[in-house]
Amino acid sequence: MAHVRHFRTLLSGFYFWEAALLLSLVATKETNSARSRSAPMSPSDFLDKLMGRTSGYDARIRPNFKGPPVNVTCNIFINSFGSIAETTMDYRVNIFLRQKWNDPRLAYSEYPDDSLDLDPSMLDSIWKPDLFFANEKGANFHEVTTDNKLLRIFKNGNVLYSIRLTLTLSCPMDLKNFPMDVQTCIMQLESFGYTMNDLIFEWQDEAPVQVAEGLTLPQFLLKEEKDLRYCTKHYNTGKFTCIEVRFHLERQMGYYLIQMYIPSLLIVILSWVSFWINMDAAPARVALGITTVLTMTTQSSGSRASLPKVSYVKAIDIWMAVCLLFVFSALLEYAAVNFVSRQHKELLRFRRKRKNKTEAFALEKFYRFSDTDDEVRESRLSFTAYGMGPCLQAKDGVVPKGPNHAVQVMPKSADEMRKVFIDRAKKIDTISRACFPLAFLIFNIFYWVIYKILRHEDIHHQQD
């Protein structure tokens, strides 16, 4: 009996300790569950659960795989816009590129925050659109002081991806109206590998393209209106989504007025000074003419140094060519004046030479027939035709009168002839003083009306 009583005592003690242990375990479990309800999940645990290895998320597969295409909304913020080069026909721009899409696999409800800003290193863990710039010639990422990238995930699965880029984009230019031209430079955003069955780019509805406040360009005026278009590309590999923005840039003429137009205008006016210089001052007028021609040639070459070698004629080429033509014409004008003013000397020299030949010919005939009969000589010879009638008389002392011995007009003297040609030369200078400025004024009217008004309006109509 004592053994049985002892066994019962041990058994009751065992039950007691077992019950106490169970109660302690239940209390611990309830405490842990209460703690889990009061303390949220840590960010690390949450990210591991959302996109870690155990989450089942595969960054290689796009959202809605084998379903509707992913719509990616794009937005651009322009930090700087410049370095527009005519020779290479490109421009440089610094932008924030923002892309937004929905990935249902990243939707969450366990974490209290409405959005999560993640480290850029997490970009490798999620799917991203394969966007590239179709007209890009060069691009740079920014890593100072860290990668200039932003990744933000929202509760509903929306993903915001922003990156800072510096791009060099091609911009084919039409320089026919240079430097009064308006250029249109484009930026094309295209998918490289996903066709439109998988991915579609769209512009953001509100403020799709933003420009930094106070942004100015050295030579261009960036117009506020920007054309947003779709530029779907068709290749052998399929149809790919593409969107583009067009920037309208109007060139400012201030630099070219100061560096090209005004100097060439003054050179042309300077060439007209020779019209007021005495025609006898040949060294001064020739030096002035040659100097202005050479200066104008140098100016014309300088205007083409910063421009590409195109096959068509630009507005600045027409201006420089006409200015060079006026300067060269002023030099030719003095050549004409000098030629006319020296004509009297040539005429006197010609008369003197002709007179000497005539007298020599008459004397030669006279001596040839001096040995023949006097009657025959008188009947056959008539010296009046050679201007020697007063020197040779007939037998009766009367000067024979031939049919050509009429009343002759006395030629003008050397001084009179010189005065006539000098007056003609001065008249050329006088006419040039009025004709050259008038012709240049007419050219300016046509030039500026055509390029600054008519063609300017045509460009705006084409853009609209």
From Swiss-Prot:
Pfam families: Neur_chan_LBD, Neur_chan_memb. It is found in: Postsynaptic cell membrane; Perikaryon; Cell projection, Dendrite; Synapse. Zn(2+) binds at E225, D227, H248. The record marks L294 as: Important for obstruction of the ion pore in the closed conformation. InterPro entries: GABAA/Glycine_rcpt (IPR006028), Glycine_rcpt_A (IPR008127), Glycine_rcpt_A3 (IPR008130), Neur_chan_lig-bd (IPR006202), Neur_chan_lig-bd_sf (IPR036734), Neur_channel (IPR006201), Neuro-gated_channel_TM_sf (IPR036719), Neuro_actylchol_rec (IPR038050). It catalyses: chloride(in) = chloride(out). Disulfide bonds join C171-C185, C231-C242. Glycine receptors are ligand-gated chloride channels. Channel opening is triggered by extracellular glycine. Channel characteristics depend on the subunit composition; heteropentameric channels display faster channel closure. Plays an important role in the down-regulation of neuronal excitability. Contributes to the generation of inhibitory postsynaptic currents. Contributes to increased pain perception in response to increased prostaglandin E2 levels. Plays a role in cellular responses to ethanol. The N-terminal domain carries structural determinants essential for agonist and antagonist binding. The channel pore is formed by pentameric assembly of the second transmembrane domain from all five subunits. The cytoplasmic loop is an important determinant of channel inactivation kinetics. This is Glycine receptor subunit alpha-3. It comes from Rattus norvegicus (Rat).
